[in-house]
């Protein structure tokens, strides 16, 4: 992205984008999403199959959500109105950072965005009324492949902001703890996530080799 910074998060497989905002007396402009920048860090172009829009009042928590891998569901998340505390959770069984989380404030001032690769858990808490979150998803809605972990699981210990009573959907309130989800075999395996990523990179490499006008030379 022109003038934007795409930095790896503390959790492997996630990135934080801080865009450069161009402002004048008319308003402002920024590049919110640019495929080639994510392709450069992922090693393959990200898929976009569905765009979601959610509006939440202050205190609402959505998540922790994740999907079976493969194919999983990568997400590119931004808050276009108000503010949320966005949380990346490593729920990949076997990962060195399993059970860890990172919180990032997303709002309509800095306009930052977060990308989460397939296999990571995602949640956020609305810090303002009418907090509006827009996110791109690599796969469409498939309820049979989607799961959750309770966002208030004390063992997970996400430090949600105080001052607002957490508001959860019935589904999220009934979600298992991280340990319960692990014992039930619901969590994606770190090895499966890595294999999925490597397969995507290999497919992209083969597709590039087969582009018209490009010649693969022997021994190269």
Q: Model-derived features: where do they sit?
A:
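Extended, polar beta-sheet/loop recognition surfaces of beta-rich domains
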Residues: 135-137, 143
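Non-catalytic, conserved peripheral segments adjacent to functional cores
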Residues: 1-109, 130, 142-220
């Amino acid at each position: 992205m022109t003038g934007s910074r795409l930095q790896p998060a503390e959790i492997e497989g996630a990135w934080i984008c801080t865009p450069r905002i161009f402002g004048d007396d008319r308003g402002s402009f920024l590049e919110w999403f640019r495929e080639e920048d994510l392709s450069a860090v992922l090693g393959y172009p990200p898929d976009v199959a569905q765009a979601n829009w959610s509006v939440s009042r202050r205190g609402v928590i959505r998540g922790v959500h994740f999907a079976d891998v493969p194919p999983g569901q990568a997400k590119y998340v931004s808050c276009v109105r108000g503010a949320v505390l966005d949380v990346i959770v490593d729920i990949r069984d076997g990962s060195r950072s399993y059970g860890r989380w990172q919180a990032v404030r997303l709002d309509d001032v800095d306009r930052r965005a977060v990308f989460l690769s397939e296999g990571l858990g995602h949640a956020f808490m609305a810090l303002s009324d009418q907090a509006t979150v827009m996110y791109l998803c690599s796969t469409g809605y498939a309820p049979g492949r989607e799961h959750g972990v309770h966002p208030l699981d004390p063992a997970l210990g996400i430090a949600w902001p105080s001052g607002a009573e957490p508001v959860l959907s019935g589904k999220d309130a009934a979600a298992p703890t991280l340990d319960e989800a692990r014992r039930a075999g619901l969590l994606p395996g770190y090895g499966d996530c890595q294999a999925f990523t490597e397969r995507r990179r290999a497919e992209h490499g083969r597709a590039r080799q087969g582009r018209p006008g490009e010649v693969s030379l022997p021994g190269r």
